[in-house]
């Protein structure tokens, strides 16, 4: 983000470094990065839940991923992180600690604009749990491990899941 005239003057130089898109006034580039990270965090959660659902229902999660990856739900997240999850490969590409930092920044930015982002808030809480449990250096697809641990607990005020989401501790 920044002044449109300056952007136009420097666009060719910027193109030498990668894809260039003008997104608006100063600060808009940072918001675009946060928007990207919100999609990444939430989508890793969605991929995790989809694979857990497939497995719980008796379907082959690898086959389910293969079946849907070229459809409407297909995405780089399903391709890359779905594969990591299925291979149980949580060596860091993007660390849980970094995803948590981004989720905190997303929530702080939303608060500054007086908006509520419920999915981002829940994902932030889940990453807080992961980091508090000492798994901050794992790849952010390790969100799957926590969601899988929580899969048998319905979300109500007496459930373990509810307690975890509000007290941030689990065993």
Predicted feature residues:
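Rossmann-fold dinucleotide-binding core
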Residues: 1-41
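Helical "substrate-binding/catalytic lid" subdomain
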Residues: 28-150
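Intrinsic-disorder-associated, low-complexity terminal segments enriched in Asp/Asn/His/Tyr and depleted
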Residues: 166-167, 171
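Long, positively charged, glycine-interspersed low-complexity recognition regions
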Residues: 158-160
């Amino acid at each position: 983000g920044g002044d449109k005239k300056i952007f136009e003057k420097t666009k060719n130089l910027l193109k030498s470094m990668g894809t260039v898109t003008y997104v608006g006034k100063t600060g808009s580039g940072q918001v675009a990065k946060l928007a990207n990270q919100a999609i990444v965090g939430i989508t890793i959660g969605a991929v995790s839940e989809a694979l857990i659902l497939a497995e719980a229902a008796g379907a082959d999660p690898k086959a389910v991923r293969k079946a849907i990856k070229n459809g409407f739900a297909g995405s780089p997240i399903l391709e890359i992180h779905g594969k990591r999850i299925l291979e149980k490969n949580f060596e860091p590409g993007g660390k849980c600690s970094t995803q948590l930092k981004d989720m905190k920044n997303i929530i702080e930015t939303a608060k500054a604009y007086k908006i509520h982002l419920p999915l981002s808030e829940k994902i932030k809480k889940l990453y807080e749990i992961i980091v508090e449990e000492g798994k901050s250096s794992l790849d952010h697809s390790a969100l799957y491990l926590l969601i899988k641990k929580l899969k048998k607990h319905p979300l109500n005020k007496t459930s373990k899941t509810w307690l975890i989401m509000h007290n941030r501790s689990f065993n």
